[in-house]
Amino acid sequence: MFALSKVLRRSQSLRLGACNAVYSKLDIPLGERNIAIESNALIHDKHEALPRFYELSWSSSTGRRSLSSDAGAKTTGDDDDLEDKNVDLATPDETSSDSEDGEEFSGDEGDIEGAELELHVPESKRPSEMFKAIVSVSGLSVGSALDKWVEQGKDTNRKEFESAMLQLRKRRMFGRALQMTEWLDENKQFEMEERDYACRLDLISKVRGWYKGEAYIKTIPESFRGELVYRTLLANHVATSNVRTAEAVFNKMKDLGFPLSTFTCNQMLILYKRVDKKKIADVLLLLEKENLKPNLNTYKILIDTKGSSNDITGMEQIVETMKSEGVELDLRARALIARHYASAGLKEKAEKVLKEMEGESLEENRHMCKDLLSVYGYLQREDEVRRVWKICEENPRYNEVLAAILAFGKIDKVKDAEAVFEKVLKMSHRVSSNVYSVLLRVYVDHKMVSEGKDLVKQMSDSGCNIGALTWDAVIKLYVEAGEVEKAESSLSKAIQSKQIKPLMSSFMYLMHEYVRRGDVHNTEKIFQRMKQAGYQSRFWAYQTLIQAYVNAKAPAYGMKERMKADNIFPNKRLAAQLAKADPFKKTPLSDLLD
């Protein structure tokens, strides 16, 4: 553990700040790179220490639970083949998620794994019969499907329900999973346990918002309102990168006397990985003080943090520390390392890791095909993309299809990407919007506007629900085609949809275009709509907004006060940018007038 703190202290990108900091009330969003502080959280350099975050005094005298919430939606080799997955391909996006499931280099892939609940059900290579019954009948509520299931005299034991729940969660079918928990609550099939309440809390937070989740906690019997319930709420605040509320829950867990766990610290690492990397070392020191050992997920978060900062040396030091502590790299960790080597241009190192992942027989390690396709596509290795896809082609799995379409797009083989898409259409009577979305992204990347428009029409005609990922691709398509009015109209439709929340990138495509034009009015409009949609003001969002004023040569009245109100403090770069739009700046002419 001490070695980990030293590795982080040696890194400029992850400076260890003053550790006399405190347990505070937190508040910040996703994935910025060079962030100055955006919240009333820890400020390392000069601002006064704010209320309590990391007093480094979490009482560890309480008994500890052995629940491992780091599991849950693990991506394993048990993804179902498409022939058994028609219902999955047909599933519309039932939740708004800020993660882009089709993105091959999603830095937060491990975050999703860490935030899911463990249901203590062994994974099966085939969907449960109850799961099939729930999703196979379109237009039928989950309650009706389960009523019919009971009428037919089929199994209604806890294991059957939990297996179906795991399948629903694994496929991110959170709306149906929530309906299932509501039906169980009404029909009292078995006695509720804390994990059942935690599962429902998680689904309510995902589908209806964290504020509804917090309201639900008040209805949970006090005897079941334990650590698992609160850390589930914490994970959902972290998933939305809401620093203020995440830190508030973290502090409340301390106040309630819950023992600090590695899972809880991992959640804070995920949060700070996205919003303020300088705080990561403080979390590690807290782990050290409480004698908690980092687990595999801790190391994966740190590997991803270093890799996404392009600190490959630091990433390799984390891996060496991990090995010295006796923690073995799993295949998912290796995939993460390979991706970061690839994005850093270290082709040979990336390919070496990929070969290690593949082992002696790719057929036996079939579950790695998705990652192999993804990274080989990024490396422009057409021969390897084709070799891996050939193994999957006859009976492809869902994630392999998404990865293959994107990989062929990366190597500029659009016809091959289209062929994979057509194969899926033939194999399934209905296709998930995600499959359309990844092909649409290929069209966007290749500026194939007419093909993209045709695909959107085809998707609409098929009756597919359009999710956040698809709206994002459509908006980008119109922006790059110069049809900004249509892009903004699409954003409005996405906002008005009650089923999804547009991705932040959907707003940013339009903001960047208006900034390029020096259009302050419309840049401000999109900035405000982004806040109204529930996204907190972020450092780089203000950076973009201020650039609109600079490009328009217009004064940015009150900008400093607005930033201060959002707890955003400029770094040197932003301060210089702000000075250019300062309405009261001195010029040679103003000096003469003075």
Swiss-Prot record:
Q: Where are the PPR repeats?
A: 226-260, 261-294, 295-329, 330-364, 432-466, 467-502, 503-537
Which residue stretches belong to region Disordered? 62-109
Keywords (A to Z) from UniProt: Mitochondrion, Repeat, Transit peptide
Query: Which is an annotated GO molecular function term of this record?
Result: mRNA binding
Give its localization: Mitochondrion
Bias type Acidic residues, positions: 95-109
Per the record, the GO terms for biological process are: mitochondrial mRNA modification
Q: Which domain of life is it from?
A: Eukaryota
Define the transit peptide region by residue numbers: 1-67
Q: What's the family? A: Belongs to the PPR family. P subfamily.
Protein name from the UniProt record: Pentatricopeptide repeat-containing protein At1g15480, mitochondrial
Origin species: Arabidopsis thaliana (Mouse-ear cress)
